[in-house]
């Protein structure tokens, strides 16, 4: 026996649900625990808090006294950032979505213009690295996923997935709003993409289960309220679901909630005129502020 290692998984969910109610005594207890860890000698004591974001990202709206307390907590920890290799994840997705070589070659020839437009739009987009292999895998290998869906899927799964609904169950399981359900009605001669709204539909049950008062749950409640006023399969509803996922991910430096991004997602299925009209309709009804 050489010591104790305490791991608090999903600490971010605790912060989202309780940070406003947490007392000064609560933060003091955590500070004392961290300080004890830092002073432990041969009988080591470690405390690991696993969170999606830095503590500083959760305290913006707190009173100054609480902000100071949480900053004191944060300063007592060594911050380690883990960056997943999503390029490998795209390769895994591509390996799951197997294509019959002869038919796929014919499809690429018939839809060369559509595929080139996708490659052209996302070639210099911050969604993917400048590595041409990653872009090729994300667009060609992961087809029929839209490139934005390919970007969102593993990151969303990382944030909210549970055993019954993950990146891999979306790709392999039967049921509604899965890859298989899309392929079952897919026309091999058409250029159709799985857009982010379908990923929203698949993970929606998990949004409901998110911690009440947490950021993701609040986004879900707002999204549901707006969707209740829209036709189920309307372009407006699809756009709202996509915007919701963009805000859940919070990676605005790479995926922004802008009109151009929405046009990029839906221009293979709808005219730019129709997309702009749908966005204008949402703005007019004050379902979105302005894109």
Give the positions of each predicted feature.
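Secondary-structure transition/capping motifs at alpha-helix termini
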Residues: 1-2, 21-25, 35-45, 232-233, ...
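Conserved P-loop NTPase "ATPase switch" module shared by AAA+ and STAND
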Residues: 2-26
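Beta-sheet entry/capping signal
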Residues: 2-6, 44-49, 77-81, 141-142, ...
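Accessory beta->alpha helical hairpin/"wing" motif in late/C-terminal subdomains of nucleic-acid enzymes
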Residues: 9, 189-205, 276-291
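Substrate-gripping "pore-loop 1 plus following alpha2 helix"
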Residues: 20-33, 61-66
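Conserved P-loop NTPase catalytic core
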Residues: 35-183, 198, 202
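Long, low-complexity, charged/polar intrinsically disordered regions in eukaryotic proteins
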Residues: 99-100, 166-230
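Terminal-proximal interaction/regulatory segments of ATP-powered molecular machines
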Residues: 224-291
């Amino acid at each position: 026996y050489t010591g104790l290692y305490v791991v608090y998984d999903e600490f971010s969910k605790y912060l989202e649900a309780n940070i406003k109610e947490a007392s000064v005594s609560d933060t003091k207890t955590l500070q004392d625990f961290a300080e004890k860890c830092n002073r432990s000698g041969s009988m080591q004591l470690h405390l690991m808090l696993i969170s999606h974001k830095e503590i500083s990202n959760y305290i913006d709206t707190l009173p100054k006294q609480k902000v100071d307390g949480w900053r004191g907590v944060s300063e007592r920890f060594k911050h380690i950032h883990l960056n997943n290799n999503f390029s490998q994840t795209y390769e895994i997705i591509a390996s799951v979505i197997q294509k019959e070589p002869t038919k796929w070659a014919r499809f690429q020839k018939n839809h060369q213009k559509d595929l080139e437009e996708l490659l052209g739009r996302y070639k210099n987009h911050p969604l993917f690295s400048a590595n041409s292999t990653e872009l090729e895998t994300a667009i060609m290998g992961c087809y029929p996923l839209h490139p934005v869906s390919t970007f969102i899927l593993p990151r969303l799964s990382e944030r909210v997935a549970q055993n019954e609904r993950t990146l891999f169950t979306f790709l392999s399981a039967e049921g509604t709003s899965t890859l298989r359900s899309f392929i079952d009605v897919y026309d091999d001669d058409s250029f159709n993409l799985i857009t982010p709204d379908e990923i929203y539909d698949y993970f929606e049950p998990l949004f409901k289960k998110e911690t009440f008062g947490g950021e993701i749950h609040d986004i879900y409640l707002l999204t549901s309220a707006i969707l209740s006023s829209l036709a189920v399969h309307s372009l407006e509803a699809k756009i709202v679901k996509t915007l919701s996922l963009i805000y859940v991910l919070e990676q605005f430096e790479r995926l922004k909630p802008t009109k151009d991004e929405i046009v990029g997602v839906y221009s293979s299925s709808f005219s730019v005129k129709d997309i702009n009209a749908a966005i204008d309709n949402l703005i007019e009804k004050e379902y979105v502020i302005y894109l």
